[in-house]
Amino acid sequence: MDRQLFENTEERPRTLHQLCEVVNKPLLELQLGCVFCKKALTASEVYNFAYTDLRVVYRDGYPYGVCKFCLLFYSKVRKLRYYNCSVYGASLEALTKKKLSDLSIRCYRCQHPLTPEEKQLHCDYKKRFHKISHMWTGSCLTCWRHTTATESAV
């Protein structure tokens, strides 16, 4: 892991791109540990963490990300513990008084931000969005294929 200590909480980079600028390293040269299992993230996991636009977390002043296994595992735990409700796209727009395109919706499985096309697919295929831990979620195209009938019903 990059052993740069960030003691001042106000100056800590929140994204991997910001962290790269501060430590003056390209993205794929960053060495981060997983905040959950403490294993070193692979180059692929670092890239995926940046693509997913998740926030860097700090423990004792050091930056951490999350590995693929822990991300999927803790997303499942989060879904099981904090599921609130499920609604169709039109209902979600009425409930929030915002268009789907203006809502920040992540995949409940892998945490990728949903694209406008993925949000539209939910409407076209009459799939629901899920409120989990006070956030609206759905399925990205990659996870859509991996979801079973019981999982899609949340």
Curated annotation (Swiss-Prot):
Mapped zinc finger ranges (unnamed): 34-70, 107-143
Chief subcellular location: host cell
InterPro entries in alphabetical order: E6, E6_sf
Gene Ontology molecular function: any one: zinc ion binding
Domain of life: Viruses
Keyword annotations from UniProtKB, A to Z: Activator, DNA-binding, Early protein, Host cytoplasm, Host nucleus, Host-virus interaction, Inhibition of host innate immune response by virus, Metal-binding, Modulation of host cell apoptosis by virus, Transcription, Transcription regulation, Viral immunoevasion, Zinc, Zinc-finger
Assigned GO CC terms: host cell cytoplasm; host cell nucleus
Stored Pfam families: E6
Location in the cell: Host cytoplasm; Host nucleus
GO biological process, one term: regulation of DNA-templated transcription
Something else known: Belongs to the low risk human alphapapillomavirus family. The cancer-causing human papillomavirus E6 protein has a unique carboxy terminal PDZ domain containing substrate but low risk E6s do not possess this domain.
HAMAP family hit by this protein: HPV_E6
Family in the record: Belongs to the papillomaviridae E6 protein family.
Subunit structure: Forms homodimers. Interacts with ubiquitin-protein ligase UBE3A/E6-AP; this interaction stimulates UBE3A ubiquitin activity. Interacts with host TP53 and EP300; this interaction inhibits TP53 activity.
Function description: Plays a major role in the induction and maintenance of cellular transformation. E6 associates with host UBE3A/E6-AP ubiquitin-protein ligase and modulates its activity. Sequesters tumor suppressor TP53 in the host cytoplasm and modulates its activity by interacting with host EP300 that results in the reduction of TP53 acetylation and activation. In turn, apoptosis induced by DNA damage is inhibited. E6 also protects host keratinocytes from apoptosis by mediating the degradation of host BAK1. May also inhibit host immune response.
Name this protein carries in UniProt: Protein E6
Species per Swiss-Prot/TrEMBL record: Human papillomavirus type 53
